[in-house]
Amino acid sequence: MTSESGSNSKWKDFLLNPKYNIVAVLAFISIFLVIGPILPGVSWFSLGDFSLDMVNFYHTIMIPFVFLLILYASELLGLGMLERKAVNVSTYPILLLTLLGTVFFYPASTQTADYVLQALRDVWMLVLALMFFVYLLMLPFRDRQKFKNIWGAYSLILITTVSAGIAAVMGMIYEYGNLFGYASLPVLNNDVMAWGGLQTFLGNLVTSHSHQMLPAVMGGIVGLAAVSFGYEKLSSVKRNIVNAGLVIAVIGTISMSYLYFISSFGTYVIPAIFTSGTGGMNGLALDDSQTGIIGIGALVTIIGLYYLLSGNRADRLVQISELLTWIATMAVMIGVGYAMEFNETYYGFGSPGVPPNGGPGYQYDMAFTDGHLLFAFFLMPLMAGILLLIMHYIKEFNTERRLITYFIIAGTIIGGFGVLEYVMTLSWVVESIGLALLIIAIIIITYTFVKSATEKDGVKGTQPAN
């Protein structure tokens, strides 16, 4: 009986050990990043939007990544014991459902199983997100001092959780309608018909889902980073600078979410602003201006977070790498993306033809679509989130941490300039080198976590909040 009790205790400690669960998710992500190029239909560099196969591959990595962020945020903020246990014990079920869904995605004979497994995984994730949200709401009442210290970061994490949750529900509604239509839901079906019909509604819905989810996730990462840096230790002036940036990001998240909501569930068409050229083709899409506000808020927070850079070289390099991912993302999205939007009479929104129905440089627009999805919407969020894990959990292994940051800094700079070259020449070679360096960094990070987690002083099971 004692032996059985000891065995159960070991399994309990294993399943509730955040570091072990982080290792599992990182290993899962690393494996799929490595085998991705050989999966059927997965083509990293193909002009235009992601194919269905590429979208499936993208979600295979990014959904576990979002789970990883929930796990980390729950531990970082010291949310309720029940919530943290629920998240930790969900690690392997989420990974297993994702794996099986990916395997069953390819054969036509198993697509129904794929739909069921991925739907189960998505509902599970939504339940975890709701638990996370509820416990976030409780935090100011459970620990008023912590809330006062990090109110700006807390507000951004809370709002981005809501925004990402709405985007997730949009994705689920889209999948249901895409598979079955809405005839079985008369009230919704009547609205869909009034909003322009099934295909119009589905198009608006999937656009809102994809355009809202990643800015919300990146905004959440900024909030988590502020807490991870320990910005509450700053002087009041510098702390207020960080809080100002976080509030700017909150405003951008709310306005972005509102725009995508009314453009999905209604007839509102998101306009462009500051238009010019034939048919008003040149101009900044209003939704892009709002997602840009989130990024601007992130850049403002850097001004204050700079003063928290560590004197330890390895720690400092990790912190600099984190901030660099934000800067690189904004450089691509604003520096390249905005410039193209104000010259759509040439780029043609990625459509061949002449203005206002297309443009001679449409292929370069398609190159940007592919390049920025891979860099700014894929590898940069991955790096930004995973770096926070290193910052929080890995305090030793200075050699490995320095090596990791060298790969990240090089990959981020080369990858960012690679997007620009892709847009200018249609050559994706430089960007591919940058992305390869970032993937190597993730593999080394996974190895370092394995090494750290297996040490005797590794993190034990989930502990009560202080």
Residue ranges and their predicted role:
Residues 19-43, 54-78, 85-108, 120-140, ...:
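Hydrophobic cores of alpha-helical transmembrane segments in multi-pass integral membrane proteins
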Residues 113-127, 312-317:
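Cytosolic-side membrane-entry/anchor segment at the start of a transmembrane helix
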Residues 38-56, 105-120, 179-204, 265-286, ...:
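Membrane-interface interhelical loops and short amphipathic "cap" helices
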Residues 11-15, 78-87, 141-152, 231-238, ...:
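Membrane-interface helix-boundary motifs at transmembrane edges
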